[in-house]
Amino acid sequence: MDESVDRVLAGKYPAKAHAKRVAARIRELGYGESGVIYLEGQKTQMIEDNDGSMPFRQRRNFFYLSGCPLPDSYLTYNIEEDHLTLFIPPIDEDSVIWSGLPLSPDEALEMYDVDAVLLTTDVNTSLAHFCSVKKGKKVFAIADQVSPHITFLPFQETDFDVLKRAAEESRVVKDTYEIALLRRANEISTKAHVAVIKAARSAANERELEAIFIATCMSYGCREQSYHPIFASGTNAATLHYQNNNEDLVDKTTGEKRLNMLVDAGGEYRTYCADITRVVPLSGKFSAESRQIYDIVLDMQMTSLAMIRAGVMWEDVHSNSHRVAIRGLLKLGILRGTEEELFDKGISVAFFPHGVGHYLGMDTHDTGGNPNYKDENPKFKYLRLRGTLACGAVVTVEPGIYFCRFIIDPYLASPELGKYIDTNVLERYWNVGGVRIEDNVVVTQNGHDNLTAAPKIPEEIEKLVAAAQ
């Protein structure tokens, strides 16, 4: 593990700096110079008709301004006085019997980057004090994230509009601490991907490899997954977000081992996500058709990475990926025509239907991307990130090519579009399923910093698979 990451993470999560950033964004948007920011953490939620609690996931905007993963917590930030207060639950004697003593206010003050820690029973009193003694007139909160017992009546003005936007826009550019968390998530997830690659040849079922991935992540400190992992063997990889992860790696119909396993998985480290995709040949060596598609996708990714720097238009990176895909598929004979007419007609969308990447942070599809899902151009409809890249933003770069009958068949059935696809050549590639290669990168002023070290050169992957036998 990178020791420089350990040195950064030895300090406190920079909640106070984040609170200042959000307040500054509120001012920039024209909502005033003063007031109090109010946020609630996620509540403990019980499983329906059961006495057990559901898996807990902290609200991301609350964590951004507190660094606190505790459920049932609150915070206030006095903008004018630059004072951040965390409210944590008091001791519940019944809970202590089962769960032990909770964090005390003194312990929380030592642990988190806040100015004061009080109990949640003090929230309303604290808000009233802000109005009466501090002459506070305005409170900023997020709609539908205020508990019924909380009162804003002492305030002259309550704003439910700007805080969510200000927090989400502030989260786009990461600071040194956040990048260290993302780097650690990638380090651990890389170990898990390598473990999966080494086990791929001997595994019998998709779920075996999923179990290896999750166990490796947990053993190194990622107790949670960033999202439901995708372990898609053979033609299952043609489904972009395949979820079942339970099929045998030997095809029951043909009795033959499936060609590849697409693994899209990443561990979550202290609320920050990794999102990595690799493709592994289950036999230990890519088939000729698999290798041809893999090389095109790798070219798509490498040319995309070469374009990334502060100020670049993400739509340009995405469009270039389509052009690389078109050139590659033309060379194989799957497509016919000219690059320009294929690009203008959107034929490559049949094989590359999603965006080339998205923001990454506390959420896998992180905030601030400004997607336009109503875009009538199919090349851009599912692009989760639009506009120019900012220095310090973290993005995924994940081009792919898929052989999904549900997506491709309408193109083949179209008199206008079907003529651009050679079905005889296409027939040889259905069993490839899909290939996607995904890295996580920090945008820098003149380029990028790739956080992902998982092997992606095909010879390296084949060597790892073979060495495990």
From Swiss-Prot:
<dbReference type="InterPro" id="IPR029149">
    <property type="entry name" value="Creatin/AminoP/Spt16_N"/>
</dbReference>
<dbReference type="InterPro" id="IPR052433">
    <property type="entry name" value="X-Pro_dipept-like"/>
</dbReference>
<dbReference type="InterPro" id="IPR036005">
    <property type="entry name" value="Creatinase/aminopeptidase-like"/>
</dbReference>
<feature type="binding site">
    <location>
        <position position="438"/>
    </location>
    <ligand>
        <name>Mn(2+) 1</name>
    </ligand>
</feature>
<dbReference type="Pfam" id="PF05195">
    <property type="entry name" value="AMP_N"/>
</dbReference>
<dbReference type="GO" id="GO:0006508">
    <property type="term" value="P:proteolysis"/>
</dbReference>
<feature type="binding site">
    <location>
        <position position="438"/>
    </location>
    <ligand>
        <name>Mn(2+) 2</name>
    </ligand>
</feature>
<dbReference type="GO" id="GO:0030145">
    <property type="term" value="F:manganese ion binding"/>
</dbReference>
<feature type="binding site">
    <location>
        <position position="275"/>
    </location>
    <ligand>
        <name>Mn(2+) 2</name>
    </ligand>
</feature>
<feature type="binding site">
    <location>
        <position position="275"/>
    </location>
    <ligand>
        <name>Mn(2+) 1</name>
    </ligand>
</feature>
<feature type="binding site">
    <location>
        <position position="398"/>
    </location>
    <ligand>
        <name>Mn(2+) 1</name>
    </ligand>
</feature>
<keyword id="KW-0479">Metal-binding</keyword>
<feature type="binding site">
    <location>
        <position position="264"/>
    </location>
    <ligand>
        <name>Mn(2+) 2</name>
    </ligand>
</feature>
<comment type="function">
    <text>Catalyzes the removal of a penultimate prolyl residue from the N-termini of peptides.</text>
</comment>
<keyword id="KW-0378">Hydrolase</keyword>
<protein>
    <recommendedName>
        <fullName>Probable Xaa-Pro aminopeptidase PEPP</fullName>
        <ecNumber>3.4.11.9</ecNumber>
    </recommendedName>
</protein>
<comment type="similarity">
    <text>Belongs to the peptidase M24B family.</text>
</comment>
<dbReference type="Pfam" id="PF00557">
    <property type="entry name" value="Peptidase_M24"/>
</dbReference>
<dbReference type="InterPro" id="IPR000994">
    <property type="entry name" value="Pept_M24"/>
</dbReference>
<dbReference type="InterPro" id="IPR007865">
    <property type="entry name" value="Aminopep_P_N"/>
</dbReference>
<keyword id="KW-0645">Protease</keyword>
<keyword id="KW-0031">Aminopeptidase</keyword>
<keyword id="KW-0464">Manganese</keyword>
<keyword id="KW-0482">Metalloprotease</keyword>
<dbReference type="GO" id="GO:0070006">
    <property type="term" value="F:metalloaminopeptidase activity"/>
</dbReference>
